[in-house]
Design a protein with these regions (language model features):
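Short linear segments in intrinsically disordered or otherwise low-structure-confidence regions
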Residues: 2-4, 8
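N-terminal regions encompassing targeting/leader/pre-sequences
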Residues: 1-2, 412
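Extreme N-terminus nucleophile/cap motif
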Residues: 77
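Acidic/glycine-enriched edge-of-secondary-structure segments
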Residues: 366-391, 402-417
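SIR2/sirtuin-family catalytic core signature
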Residues: 21-59, 65-68, 81-99, 338, ...
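Extended, H/D-rich, highly charged conserved domains that either
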Residues: 95-385
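Short Gly/Ser/Thr- and charged-rich N-terminal loops/segments
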Residues: 12-15
Length: 484
């Protein structure tokens, strides 16, 4: 198709679309402009994919905090095997101080072979490996009380949220409640050390495991799937009907080249849909009006959940992948020729212009309000809302959600309190029409849907709104279904 300049396209559209204007600088202008005459903020409907650590885990990446702590100790144990006799990095220390310890170390040398450490995930069945673990525990000790608490949480619960743990300690410090730290500066120093190790660990994971083959077709199809009437909140059906009307007019009046521009970002074409569209048109003609297409019939079919409505009538206008991870797994789903956007809201590995944000973000908590009154900036150093101002990521997110109604897909994000401020902004926004969680299903058939909903509820002040917007389990499914 022949596409015009951005300025001319907007003039032709005759509408104000501030978000899309901002995107022209860094999006694929060609596919955007072909769709420009259709862009009306009041009649479009977008989708935000909320991506958390469970998304990386679903792709087989060892990126949980428990994996990270395990990796940290692998590195420390490796240093001893390679000949170091004393370790102390501020988090933990270990010392081989006598001849008995030196003799014990000799029997573990076989764990090193050709410079490679044989102690890896899944090797715990080896007796000598277990003995080395016990030996390391005997000669090591914690140098950081905060790091010790993280380890004990993993030992007792088999998981930990380091950011939530940090905020708990910050509150204990503020309340002078049996806190081993005398100043937030000391606590922040330990957090910075942990953050540095975490970044190093994730870089290793990404370098070793990241590859295009990780992309799962079932997840990609879910990201790009059509809207479903059962997912839309009752309080937002008016906006959904406006979207249906605008999309109907577009697909039934524009030429094929224009429609192709829109469908290409989903990896589709008008040719693939043409026969379905033609058949569908025949089913909604009004015989009393010279076979004109009847919009009301179309809207009724969608609202009645009739299966013969072609999916192209229900595809989102824009898709934003909101990535809370530091890794690049989400980038696999921004395909060539797509106009979808990705926002690494918490920073990226190896990108100085988008630094890692690691801390806590719950301004709705009563204790936070008291901490803010202390007039002590050291307490606010790792509060996410402040760190967001280091880049334009948060501002771009606000621009997106203000531009048009949107649905939220939750993929691998626990929706815990460490991101409560941002999630509340999304979930209670006037343009949010639906929140659909994709849960984790265990091998025994159980799942974490209820736990996820409980976490989501804490991000709402208005429970009535929550019950309307969150999609019930009948219409939800696992992030990675069996066989995917």
């Amino acid at each position: 198709p022949i596409c015009v300049s951005p300025a001319v396209a907007i003039l032709l559209a005759g509408r104000t679309v501030p978000y899309y204007l901002g995107r022209l600088v860094h999006s694929r202008i060609n596919s955007y402009l072909c769709y420009a005459p259709f862009l009306n903020a009041e009649q479009t409907m977008n989708r935000i994919i909320l991506i958390g650590n469970g998304f990386d885990l679903a792709h087989g990446l060892p990126t949980s905090y428990a994996d990270f702590i395990r990796g940290y100790y692998i590195i420390q144990k490796l240093k001893l095997l390679e000949g170091e006799s004393e370790l102390n990095d501020g988090l933990c220390s270990a010392e081989i101080s006598d001849s008995e310890d030196q003799r014990a170390m000799q029997q573990f040398r076989w764990l090193l072979k050709d410079g490679m450490f044989k102690f890896t995930r899944g090797c715990g069945e080896n007796t000598l490996t277990k003995n080395y673990d016990r030996f390391f525990d005997k000669i090591s000790k914690y140098e950081s009380k905060f790091f010790e608490a993280i380890n004990k949480a993993i030992e007792t619960k088999n998981w930990v949220d380091i950011e939530s743990e940090y905020y708990s300690w910050l509150k204990k410090l503020y309340k002078r409640d049996k806190c081993e730290y005398t100043s937030p500066v000391l606590l922040d120093k330990d957090l910075e050390m942990i953050k540095a190790y975490l970044i190093t660990y994730l870089k290793i994971v990404q370098q070793k495991h990241f590859q295009p083959e990780l992309k799962k077709e079932c997840i990609y199809q879910t990201i790009c799937e059509p809207f479903h009437i059962n997912d839309i909140a009752y309080g937002n059906r008016k906006e959904f009907d406006e979207f249906l009307t605008a999309r109907f007019e577009y697909l039934t009046t524009e030429n094929e080249a224009e429609i192709d521009c829109f469908l290409q970002q989903f990896g589709q074409s008008h040719l693939s849909w043409r026969s379905d569209i033609d058949l569908y048109k025949d089913s909604i003609r009004d015989q009393n009006k010279q076979d004109a297409l009847d919009l009301s019939k179309h809207i009724k079919k969608v609202n009645d959940n009739k299966g013969d409505v072609p999916g192209c009538f229900l595809l989102p206008d824009q898709i934003l992948l909101l990535n809370f991870n530091y890794t690049s797994t989400a980038d696999l789903y921004v395909t060539k020729g797509s106009d979808f956007e990705i926002n690494h809201i918490h920073g990226e590995l190896d990108n100085d212009k988008n630094p890692i944000i690691f801390g806590y973000g719950d301004e709705l908590d009563d204790d936070y309000k008291e901490i803010a009154k202390l007039n002590d900036n050291d307490y606010l150093k790792n509060i996410k809302s402040i760190r967001y101002l280091e880049t334009d990521n948060y501002r771009r997110l606000l621009s997106f959600i203000d531009s048009a109604p949107f649905q939220i897909y939750i993929m691998g994000h626990s929706c815990g309190n460490s991101d409560r401020t941002l999630l509340n902004t999304l979930f209670e926004h006037k343009n949010c029409v639906s929140i659909k969680p994709f849960y984790y299903q265990k091998d025994d058939g159980s799942d974490n849907y209820i736990e996820l909903i409980q976490n989501i509820s804490r991000n709402f002040n208005d429970m009535r709104l929550m019950r309307d917007r969150v999609v019930n389990k009948s219409y939800c499914r696992p992030l990675v279904p069996a066989g995917c």
